[in-house]
């Protein structure tokens, strides 16, 4: 195509990807990617003995030559990516993005870790793959904020497949046409519904690894000249017309404007707590309030001011959120996370267990927590928290957290 205006968004991004040199990636972006990579490696080890990891390992039927940190088995590339991605995301302690929550490290680090070993890549090649894939995931998240969640899909699962696809395409040195096709192909592989919220089941954990493996498959198909639609993003049946709520109009300028001169990857955040992204500011509020309460039994009620876009995932059904049925569902319950913050003063891996979801003192606090939608809340542009604790003597303790700790406002 001779005219840039005629190019589809996938072609524009693929052209930038193909031409990108390592020296063009800002140092602060490289530093952020390295931090995310190290964080992800730690999480692979942290979850290596969890039941869901054992279940995935036992499901594999093929062997290979790819290593998974913390495990003796050698796997084929796609299985290694699935296991690594699930391990990184499994405890919801991995990085997140402010704009629409997507978990970049669990997809990109699992994919490029396997690619690095399989293709014996040099460090700069790995970092280039991580950079382009991370940037695509972040920019796709900004095209139509909240729309994918509202439609019932997990943004990391859908958008992550594209990040992995272009990251692997970069290290394979796919041409612009091959990379564009790879993105078009992976659009038919992307999937991941949020019905796990209903009963706190494990499927969300699987999403990043599956997205990464889809990226691996699609990039290799593109490398061998299998054709995919170049209008996979903006087309009539593209992902934003298939996986996103039509009431939220996509802004495709977010995908390509300032490409190369502004890096959204630099806005990736490291979570302080092992639970859902939007629970984090409320835990900070709870920990601050804890210092002002002599006895947690003095609490009469707790009212939280929240963004409307968080309610369907983290607050409703309120009966389930006040009494989570599994340790995993507890990670996506703001009432439980607040109660944990008040009770323990922290919210790490050991605060979300079978023992704690049955802890009567924690559940008693949960039963007192409710929410009000705040029209002024900036979600998803900013992740903030506000709680008002009413004590039995009518004293009110108000705490706010203006932004996500580990994010752009509180790095």
Role assignments for model-derived ranges:
Residues 107-109, 152-171, 181-254:
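Amphipathic alpha-helical interface segments
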Residues 30, 34, 38, 108, ...:
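Hydrophobic face of alpha-helices
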Residues 59, 129-133, 182-189, 305:
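Short acidic/histidine-centered micro-motifs embedded in hydrophobic/aromatic stretches
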Residues 41, 108-115, 130-140, 161-169, ...:
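Buried hydrophobic packing segments
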Residues 1-102, 203-213, 220-411:
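Terminal-appendage/accessory-domain detector
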Residues 87-142:
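Hydrophobic alpha-helical hairpins/lids featuring a short glycine-rich hinge
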């Amino acid at each position: 195509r001779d005219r840039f205006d005629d190019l589809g968004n996938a072609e524009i991004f693929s052209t930038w990807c193909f031409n990108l040199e390592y020296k063009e990636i800002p140092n602060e972006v490289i530093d952020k990617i390295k931090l995310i990579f190290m964080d992800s490696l730690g999480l692979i080890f942290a979850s290596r003995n969890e039941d869901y990891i054992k279940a995935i390992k036992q499901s594999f039927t093929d062997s290979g030559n790819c290593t998974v940190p913390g495990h003796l088995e050698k796997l084929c590339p796609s299985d290694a990516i699935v296991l690594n991605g699930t391990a990184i995301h499994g405890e919801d302690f991995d990085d997140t993005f402010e704009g629409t929550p997507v978990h970049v490290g669990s997809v990109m680090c699992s994919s490029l870790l396997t690619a690095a070993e399989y293709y014996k890549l040099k460090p700069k090649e790995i970092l280039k793959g991580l950079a382009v894939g991370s940037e695509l995931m972040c920019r796709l998240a900004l095209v139509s904020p909240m729309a994918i969640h509202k439609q019932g899909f997990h943004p990391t699962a859908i958008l992550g497949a594209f990040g992995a696809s272009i990251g692997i395409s970069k290290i394979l040195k796919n041409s612009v046409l091959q990379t564009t096709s790879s993105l078009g192909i992976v659009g038919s592989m992307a999937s991941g519904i949020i019905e796990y919220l209903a009963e706190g089941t494990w499927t969300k954990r699987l999403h990043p690894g599956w997205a990464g493996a889809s990226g691996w498959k699609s990039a290799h198909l593109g490398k061998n000249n299998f054709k995919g639609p170049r209008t996979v993003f903006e087309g009539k049946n593209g992902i934003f017309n298939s996986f996103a709520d039509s009431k939220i109009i996509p802004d495709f300028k977010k995908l390509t404007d300032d490409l190369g001169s502004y890096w959204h990857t630099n806005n990736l955040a490291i979570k302080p707590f092992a639970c859902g992204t939007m629970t984090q500011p409320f835990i900070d509020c709870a920990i601050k309030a804890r210092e002002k309460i002599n006895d947690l039994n003095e609490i009469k009620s707790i009212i939280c001011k929240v963004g409307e876009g968080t309610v369907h995932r983290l607050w409703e059904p309120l009966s389930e959120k006040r009494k989570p049925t599994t340790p995993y569902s507890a990670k996506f319950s703001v009432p439980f996370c607040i109660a944990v913050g008040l009770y323990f003063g922290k919210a790490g891996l050991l605060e979300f267990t079978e023992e704690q979801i049955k802890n009567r003192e924690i559940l008693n606090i949960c039963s007192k927590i409710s929410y009000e939608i705040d029209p002024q809340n900036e979600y998803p542009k900013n992740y903030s928290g506000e709680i008002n604790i009413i004590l039995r003597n009518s004293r009110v303790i108000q705490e706010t957290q203006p932004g996500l700790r580990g994010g752009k406002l509180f790095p």
